[in-house]
């Protein structure tokens, strides 16, 4: 059995590779080419465990990803999100490979936001805000820089030390001007990415400039929320999956519960955009929101690409 560690993945693929892969994956998802049961969630003491199976119809493999989400302990220096992806031969069910899932998860999630940004953010977007300072936040920044000419990044965290450390890391690795931000900076920002486990909205509509694009990837349970209802009501909302968002997108679930917004107001699933490439032109001058909960086909598509490159 092949075993692939996180540190090996970066040597095989770039973020641009992943964005192209995930864009095609969304089109294939729209065409119904994947068998993908609803993600199962199990609560355990101190955290959440997720299981995500997927099979490409007539494909060579099927995958099952297991993800654990725990708040990092100050005593045990564990990561918040840890995962593994099992790859099986679809002809005989044999286990072919086991991939560390953390880097794949971070890269494909960043890439999904990159795809949405490619279609909905203003082409000359230069200013980015990132909420969160973990691995998911880094790949959000990385993907934004692949699809837009980002010159300045404002970093937001509840912990000033974390925002400074992350800013320095981004500046050094990605060669871009990154600095801790304050809410007033959002009036300058063209694109916002949120990658936090927040249970309270991070900012409000009044904080934003007109025509901003937001990628919200942090909330995956009904009680989690990053984006306020007033923003959702005043934005073109795109989702990775309407079905999954009704179960897992806390921002949207709470907006429907507590405001006049309804799921019928969703503009489109991202797959319909990548497949048809015609709706995004209506939204470039408007606020847009891509709400992603993550889908199993993204892991399968990326592991397929990795196996081809090995």
PLM region descriptions:
Residues 128-129, 288:
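Conserved beta-strand elements of the Class I
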Residues 147-170:
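NAD(P)-binding Rossmann-fold cofactor-contacting core
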Residues 1-106, 114, 124, 268, ...:
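N-terminal ligand-binding/catalytic initiation module
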Residues 137-138:
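N-terminal Rossmann-fold NAD(P) dinucleotide-binding loop
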Residues 8, 224-310:
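Adenosine-phosphate binding glycine-rich loop
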Residues 175-260:
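Rossmann-like adenosine-cofactor binding region
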Residues 133-134:
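Glycine-rich Rossmann-fold phosphate-binding loop(s) that bind the pyrophosphate
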Residues 120-127, 149, 209-210:
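Short helix-loop-beta connector
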């Amino acid at each position: 059995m092949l075993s692939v560690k996180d540190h090996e993945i970066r040597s095989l693929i770039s973020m641009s590779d992943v964005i192209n892969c995930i864009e095609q994956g969304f089109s294939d998802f729209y065409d119904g080419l994947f068998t993908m049961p609803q993600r199962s969630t199990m609560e355990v003491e101190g955290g959440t465990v997720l299981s995500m199976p997927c099979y490409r119809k007539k494909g060579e493999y099927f995958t099952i990803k297991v993800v654990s989400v725990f708040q990092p302990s100050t005593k045990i220096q564990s990561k918040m999100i840890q995962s593994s992806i099992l790859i099986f031969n679809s002809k005989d069910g044999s286990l072919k490979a086991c991939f560390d899932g953390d880097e794949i998860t971070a890269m494909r999630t960043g890439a999904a936001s990159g795809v949405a940004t490619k279609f909905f953010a203003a082409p000359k977007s230069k200013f980015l805000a990132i909420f969160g300072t973990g691995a998911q936040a880094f790949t959000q920044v990385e993907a934004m820089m692949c699809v837009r000419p980002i010159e300045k990044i404002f970093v937001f965290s509840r912990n000033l030390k974390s925002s400074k450390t992350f800013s320095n890391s981004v500046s050094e690795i990605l060669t871009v001007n990154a600095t801790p931000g304050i809410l007033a900076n959002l009036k300058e920002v063209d694109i916002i990415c949120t990658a936090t486990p927040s249970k309270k909205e991070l900012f409000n509509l009044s904080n934003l400039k007109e025509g901003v694009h937001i990628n919200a990837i942090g909330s995956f349970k009904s009680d989690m929320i990053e984006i306020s209802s007033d923003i959702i009501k005043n934005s073109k909302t795109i989702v990775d999956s309407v079905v999954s968002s009704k179960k897992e997108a806390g921002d949207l679930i709470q907006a429907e519960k507590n405001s006049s917004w309804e799921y019928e107001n969703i503009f489109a699933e991202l797959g319909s955009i990548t497949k048809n490439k015609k709706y995004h032109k209506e939204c470039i001058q408007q606020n847009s929101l891509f709400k992603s909960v993550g889908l199993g086909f993204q892991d399968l598509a990326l592991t397929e690409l990795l196996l081809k490159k090995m």
